[in-house]
Amino acid sequence: MKSKIALSCEKCKIKNYKTNKSIIERLELKKFCSRCKEHTIHKEEK
């Protein structure tokens, strides 16, 4: 079953991306943050 999650920037804590995931582990991706204007680590938020 896929669950809906939000990805938030580790630096500024803004929620930039929404996605679905089907794995159990917490998701952590390097994505572009529009507020920081750079690629940062984005972690999963519920």
Curated annotation (Swiss-Prot):
Transmembrane segments: none
Keyword Ribosomal protein: yes
One Gene Ontology biological process: translation
GO molecular function: structural constituent of ribosome
One GO term describing the cellular component: ribosome
Alphabetically ordered keywords of this record: Ribonucleoprotein, Ribosomal protein
Family, similarity comment: Belongs to the bacterial ribosomal protein bL33 family.
Protein name, per record: Large ribosomal subunit protein bL33B
Native source species: Mycoplasmopsis pulmonis (strain UAB CTIP)
Lineage: Bacteria, Bacillati, Mycoplasmatota, Mycoplasmoidales, Metamycoplasmataceae
